[in-house]
Amino acid sequence: MKTSFILSASLAIHAAIVAHEKDIESLDRAIGDGDHYINIKRGSEAIAGMYNALLPLPPEEVLLQIGNKLLSAIGGASGPLLASFFMGMAKFLQLNNDKANELNSNLEHAAMFAYGVQTLMMRGKSNVGEKTMLDVLVPASTTFTHAAAQGKTVTEICKEVKNAADKGLEYTRDLVASKGRAAGLGERAIGHLDPGAKSCQVMINAVCDLILKK
């Protein structure tokens, strides 16, 4: 895991978030508070603006600072949740600091991603099936781990992870929400995709597409 890749991924994520403004906003207006896109864009923009300052730092410090910035820049529930994801990945690198700059295997990257997702789950006290971003993140993480364990190529892994994220997003359409404003809608939320899940699907696809272009 290299700092340059983390920062390139952050730029790709910001560009993808901006490109999907209408999609995310329409979903949030339907079942959310209507401010999810603004908050996510603010966070991704803030991270993109830290590029030069973060470039000299080691990966674990970059991920930690990204988490801290998201915590302060993003309002609502998304800020602490996304911050915990990046802080979790930073913690993974800190716990494996003897190879923080040598995290090169697909299995190691999958383990880092999974640690971040688990940290987010603990922070949000939520799980799959509750119409949240976890309905995208968990299957993407599980797919990443399984594909890496099977020795698949980076290209194969990225394609499978993208597919898992897409399916996870679609899965939220038929769910009743148990978190946030959407929970108050009960069965009226059925038929709508979760905006947080959509944002995560956009982010995952952006990073995978960045890798596939290399």
Q: Each predicted region: which residue ranges?
A:
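N-terminal loops that bind phosphate or other acidic moieties
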Residues: 1-214
